[in-house]
Amino acid sequence: MEGHTDMEILRTVKGSSTGEVNVHLVARDSAGPHPQLPTTAFIIPTNAATLGLPSTALDVPYPREPVHVGALERVAGSEPVTATILPQLSTGTGTNSTVRLLDWTGVSAPLPGSGMRFRINEYAPLNMIGVERPRSPEQRHEGGMARRDAGIQHPDVHQDRQDITSLEPPVDASSCKCQACGPQQSSGLDVGSSGDRCSQPFQKRSVIVENSGCTIASELLKPMKKRKHKEYQSPSEESEPEAVKQGEGKDAEREPTPSTPENEEWSRSQLVSSEKKDGWSWESYLEEQKAVTAPVSLFQDSQAVTHNKNGFKLGMKLEGIDPQHPSMYFILTVAEVCGYRLRLHFDGYSECHDFWVNANSPDIHPAGWFEKTGHKLQLPKGYKEEEFSWSQYLRSTKAQAAPKHLFVSQSHSTPPVGFQVGMKLEAVDRMNPSLVCVASVTDVVDSRFLVHFDDWGDTYDYWCDPSSPYIHPVGWCQKQGKPLTPPQDYPDPDSFCWEKYLEETGTSAVPNWAFKVRPPHSFLVNMKLEAVDRRNPALIRVASVEDVEDHRIKLHFDGWSHNYDFWIDADHPDIHPAGWCSKTGHPLEPPLRPRESSSVSPGGCPPLSHRSPPHTKTSKYNFHHRKCPTPGCDGSGHVTGKFTAHHCLSGCPLAEKNQSRLKAELSDSETAARKKNPSNLSPRKKPRHQGRIGRPPKYRKIPEEDLQALPPSVVHQSLFMSTLPTHADRPLSVCWEQHCKLLPGVAGISASTVSKWTIEEVFGFVQTLTGSEDQARLFKDEMIDGEAFLLLTQADIVKIMSVKLGPALKIYNAILMFKNTDDAFK
């Protein structure tokens, strides 16, 4: 044999009991110009039961490790290893093989560069008959004496090659002839001659040998790169990364096993394999903080465990409830899939209305659900109700309807007993939690029903079940000594009487026995969990329980300012136990570290100056400040909710200066003592000629100290004053003379005077300022008095009240003028 031979051996110890070793040999003769075929060798201990060989090299799921073939390691203690090597023989005449690489002398041959010797018989292509192990002379002598005493005829492969013939075991009485294997050496083992023990392994091996000649695929012919030699690792060190890789592969293929909330083992296992980002993990974080996670048993099944995979795909269409109008159903499209969550888009509307839900949300339904249940479906623009059909719509949009099996079936749920459409009750206004109002049941779906406040818009509606702490039977306020808010425009609200009202409306009250008592939750302060960031719903962050009530918890995002804390229901679908993101494949935002909060920005960029440098002639725009300067912000989301990303401070939803611009989501999140803000006004999505929709919020007198607490930084300069540099340290009074001339009726009026205005006085001022009675009537319809008028922002005036931009700028700047003339409102 001439030329250099390279070998690669794939060795994987599968178990300690059998000591099975898989070896992948690839022989290449560098001197020959012809292609080499890979040879797969499987080294099997004598006590191995069954051998299963892959059909191709790609079926072997173990990493290849290059091994210097010298002294072969023993496995399972001192048990010798007997190998059966099945070479990939080719029928070609000029093709080299492993058989040709061996230096044959008689019926046996050594493998060049190693201590292994092989022989050929008529049943198996190659049998390894010995392995050389480096031993001391004393050990060699003692080993030879022990073998002679035991009668074992193992050859000593460390002898010279001239004694090869004498190394072959003689055929004597100790040799047994197996019907399946032929003449074999017993080696001191009790091997029967019937072949019962080896017939089945032999048949399997024969099939493999026969099929091995026809598995010469293109993948097997590809050359294999020689790996670098790795240092030896202990079996525990070797098996650990392999177990992790194999476990990950299995988790990706198999269905998640259903678990119960009491299964704490699931929680602990998820902490170990939790989401890691920049070296962060739940396990190390809990150890560092000396904290504990909220037990899985405290969460609802829909919050803690996902029994099904998220099978929704991009572009799938379905039906769902509008979160802003819970009584309306729209056609939705899956715009994004992240873990077990979906971002849904309203067909025919701007993406600024997109919202996130869990895949097991009860608010989404398959296509055609509205027809079966008798609900009305809000169609995209350009479609008529009498002409719409799902099949035609899917064809025209070239889309696919989400399969029905992806939706969480609630058909088995028991309908709420005692709650029927039209029945009356008393319910808490979740946007104004201090108010309890007259309400009705307007819809029943599965185990939930829709609560609607009489004579008010549907933006205040919400879905609940009989155990909700926000609903009460008729007469509850009177028993508790609390005021009851009657329906809007009720003739005599001070003398409202339930008996009279039920008789006038021809309705009945929900029976008292229909209401269920929900036990308080068991969350404790400082427990850790995972929660959706309400300012940027695409993100889930590490959170802690800051405070608790009977049915609500106050959450704090670890590492962030307490300005972002908020209240949420304990059964809200936006909170999950620790490890939920890891289990569902959703990214988890780790806590903001002190080094991050102290840094100026994630990119190390200095804060934005008030006056941007002029653009150079070589570039159309200045891209220096492309990263958001807010510490810990990754640039996702937008303060207006219309965009998925931002790159400046003005659009950051996490910036403290933008907190007043965020839409106030009071349901489930604010305390009853929170002052009512006009930002809760219902958006006008319907034409004005259809009348006012929604109800005006109720206001209470706000102490002056609360108004004094408003920082000047929350008062943003409007576009009307964009001609002057917006320096934070420049007082607004320097612009007074310039802008007072453009705002008639503003001069000489202070904020303290405006705060005492009635609704009619606000109406008259806006009419004088804008010169339009229609614009002023909007303020009158919403019952905005002077105190509420001062709390309006430009976004409230333009987006919520639907005032045109020109008049809105005048009104908002007039409010700024009022505030800056009174020290108490600055």
Curated annotation (Swiss-Prot):
> For site (Positioned at the entrance of MBT 2 and is required for recognition of monomethylated and dimethylated peptides), what residue positions does UniProt give?
N432
Tissue localization of expression is: Highly expressed in brain, testis, eyes, and ES cells.
Q: Where are the MBT repeats?
A: 280-380, 388-487, 496-591
Which Pfam families does this entry report, sorted A to Z?
Answer: MBT, SAM_1, zf-C2HC
Report residues binding Zn(2+). Answer: C628, C633, H646, C652
Classify the main location.
nucleus
Subcellular location(s) per record: Nucleus
Provide the phenotype resulting from gene inactivation.
No visible phenotype. Mice develop and reproduc normally. Mice were followed for more than 2 years, without any alteration in normal lifespan or survival with or without sublethal irradiation.
Claim: NADP is one of the keywords in the record = no
Location of site Mediates recognition of monomethylated and dimethylated peptides?
A: D429
Basic and acidic residues: bias regions: 242-256
Q: Where is the composition biased (Basic residues)?
A: 612-621, 683-699
**Where does the record place the modification Phosphoserine?**
S136
Q: Specify the superkingdom.
A: Eukaryota
Per UniProt, the keywords (alphabetical) are: Chromatin regulator, Metal-binding, Nucleus, Phosphoprotein, Repeat, Repressor, Transcription, Transcription regulation, Ubl conjugation, Zinc, Zinc-finger
InterPro entries, per database record: Mbt, MBT_L3MBTL1_rpt1, MBT_L3MBTL1_rpt3, PcG_chromatin_remod_factors, SAM, SAM/pointed_sf, Znf_C2H2C, Znf_C2H2C_sf
Q: Where are the zinc fingers (CCHHC-type)?
A: 619-662
Oligomeric form and interacting partners: Homodimer. Interacts with RB1/RB (when monomethylated at 'Lys-860'). Interacts with p53/TP53 (when monomethylated at 'Lys-382'). Interacts with CBX3, ETV6, KMT5A and VCP/p97.
Q: What is known of its domains?
A: The MBT repeat 2 specifically recognizes and binds monomethylated and dimethylated proteins. In contrast, it does not bind trimethylated proteins. The MBT repeat 1 does not bind methylated peptides but inserts a proline ring in a Pro-Ser-Ser/Thr sequence context.
Q: What name has this protein been given in UniProt?
A: Lethal(3)malignant brain tumor-like protein 1
Task: Give the organism, scientific name.
Answer: Mus musculus
For this protein's source organism, the top of the classification is: Eukaryota, Metazoa, Chordata, Craniata, Vertebrata
**What gene codes for this chain?**
L3mbtl1
